Amino acid sequence: MSPDELVYLGILAATIPVGFLFRYLSPPVKQGAALLLGLIISIATCGIHTLHSLCTVLGTWIIIKINWRSAPALSLAWTFLYLLFFRLVTWFGLPQPTPFANAIQLLLTLKMVSLANEVQSYHLERKKEVSTFTKSPVVAGLSHEPSLYDIISYSYCYVGIMTGPFFRYQTYADWLQQSSPLSLPGKEPCLQRLKMVPVYGLLFIAVNSVFPLSYVRTEDFLEHNYFYRFFYMVAIFFVFRMRFYSAWCGAEAGCISAGLGCYPQGALSKPGGGPTVKYSPDPETAVEYDFKTIQNIDCYNTDFCVKVRHGMRYWNMTVQWWLHHYIYPNAPFRAYALRAGWTMLISAYWHGLHAGYYLSFLTIPLCIAAETAMEASVRARLGPAGQNIFDWIHWFLKMRAYDYMCMGFVLLKASDTISYWSSIYFVIHIIAIVCIAVGQFMKGGRKREKRERGEGEKEDAVREKAE
């Protein structure tokens, strides 16, 4: 493990026991202590680069104060343009930010855009209440516009400051105002989330030592046979998953220990978004709680869901919620594959400027189009047994597609990514294009069958009338 990874691990490990202490604090003390601890972590790991995140926060606050109506669009433009400056600071003679500063900046970008949307919703709903004299039906809406102190406290809250998960300002405010945090579940769900982390960590270390990523860039790698080169991406994606499984499960445990994102099960919370329905518990029955709001990874479904599009739902779930609510609806396209492509383009930009991100993320819409074509033209014609076989083949190809795309994500450079993909003959791209072509061909045949069947039925009807 690199020194940076050890620092991440140390911060993650420390936040879990610290979280339990926060349950004993009153709301004002909890807010101040969480801010202080977050600032200590930020300054200790980022130093002077903490100013980047502070500029982002202050800029968003100014936008909200000046024009809350247009704040969502303006904050998105501001934070994403600042990301560009942040990544090109060396062009202006400024020092390169640390990886820790980059992690904080990424999560802060999501928080600021979400905050602007929440404030806009608050003002719009308040106007409706005044004009209609009725209570707003919005679930989990703000009760007041956050002050500058509130915004800074939310931005630098120590929980998930570098590792996520993303959570809305309302989730943060609900955490501060919990009436009896000591009575909420903590130890058991925390241990439940941590129980597989040692396994993930050991698998990460073991497989990474046998299949190092750096070997892919060597000339010796290309001397191996095709099947070895193909299998290597399977191992690399396995290492990638184990790394993030362990990190995100640990980050979720840090939220759970502090009680952040704890809501009654009846609230039907969504990862990242929080409650989706208003919930009034029955005073005569025990209330059961969950931490769905801060769930960032579903390890089982990531591995065993069938479709490429479903795989995205279970990976980095809170960020997927953010993309689905703030980017996907505003895409300048109507077709699902094109809207997904737009969303993936924005996601790639959020991750960074390396070409490998774009090559990987923009392969996803192609795979989605391929699986959609095959489902409509092939799976729909099969019986239950045939569909079961189809789904297993689909799952296998889904995993290989993510293996393939992961290589661009970790190799980063366009030359390295294309060099590897060419060494396995761009197999996933070719399979996807073939699937789309087969789907279109069979779709055309199905239309001809329907047309011929319809013409035959018309001829039979005419013949019956003549007789």
Curated annotation (Swiss-Prot):
- Tell me the membrane topology, using the record's own terms: Multi-pass membrane protein
The reaction(s) this protein catalyses: a 1-acyl-sn-glycero-3-phospho-(1D-myo-inositol) + (5Z,8Z,11Z,14Z)-eicosatetraenoyl-CoA = a 1-acyl-2-(5Z,8Z,11Z,14Z-eicosatetraenoyl)-sn-glycero-3-phospho-(1D-myo-inositol) + CoA; (5Z,8Z,11Z,14Z)-eicosatetraenoyl-CoA + 1-hexadecanoyl-sn-glycero-3-phosphocholine = 1-hexadecanoyl-2-(5Z,8Z,11Z,14Z-eicosatetraenoyl)-sn-glycero-3-phosphocholine + CoA; a 1-acyl-sn-glycero-3-phospho-(1D-myo-inositol) + an acyl-CoA = a 1,2-diacyl-sn-glycero-3-phospho-(1D-myo-inositol) + CoA; 1-octadecanoyl-sn-glycero-3-phospho-(1D-myo-inositol) + (5Z,8Z,11Z,14Z)-eicosatetraenoyl-CoA = 1-octadecanoyl-2-(5Z,8Z,11Z,14Z-eicosatetraenoyl)-sn-glycero-3-phospho-(1D-myo-inositol) + CoA
Task: Give the main location.
Answer: endoplasmic reticulum
Q: Report whether Glycoprotein shows up as a keyword of the record.
A: yes
> Where located?
Endoplasmic reticulum membrane
Gene Ontology cellular component list: endoplasmic reticulum membrane; membrane; mitochondria-associated endoplasmic reticulum membrane contact site
Topological domains on the Lumenal side lie at: 23-33, 94-193, 261-421
Can you name one GO molecular function term for this protein?
A: O-acyltransferase activity
Disordered, as annotated region? 447-467
Q: Which UniProt keywords apply?
A: Acyltransferase, Endoplasmic reticulum, Glycoprotein, Lipid biosynthesis, Lipid metabolism, Membrane, Phospholipid biosynthesis, Phospholipid metabolism, Transferase, Transmembrane, Transmembrane helix
TM segments?
6-22, 34-57, 74-93, 194-211, 231-260, 422-442
Q: Which InterPro entries match?
A: LPLAT_7/PORCN-like, MBOAT_fam
* Pfam families associated with the record: MBOAT (PF03062)
| Pathway participation | Lipid metabolism; phospholipid metabolism
Sequence ranges on the Cytoplasmic membrane side: 1-5, 58-73, 212-230, 443-467
Gene Ontology annotations of biological process type: lipid modification; phosphatidylcholine acyl-chain remodeling; phosphatidylinositol acyl-chain remodeling; phosphatidylinositol biosynthetic process; regulation of triglyceride metabolic process
Domain of life the protein comes from: Eukaryota
Basic and acidic residues composition-biased segments: 451-467
Q: What is its EC number?
A: 2.3.1.-
Which of this chain's residues carry glycans? 316
Q: Is ATP-binding among the key words of this record?
A: no
Q: What family does this chain come from, according to its entry? A: Belongs to the membrane-bound acyltransferase family.
Q: What does this protein do?
A: Acyltransferase which catalyzes the transfer of an acyl group from an acyl-CoA to a lysophosphatidylinositol (1-acylglycerophosphatidylinositol or LPI) leading to the production of a phosphatidylinositol (1,2-diacyl-sn-glycero-3-phosphoinositol or PI) and participates in the reacylation step of the phospholipid remodeling pathway also known as the Lands cycle. Prefers arachidonoyl-CoA as the acyl donor, thus contributing to the regulation of free levels arachidonic acid in cell.
Q: What is this protein identified as?
A: Membrane-bound acylglycerophosphatidylinositol O-acyltransferase mboat7
Q: Give the organism, scientific name.
A: Danio rerio
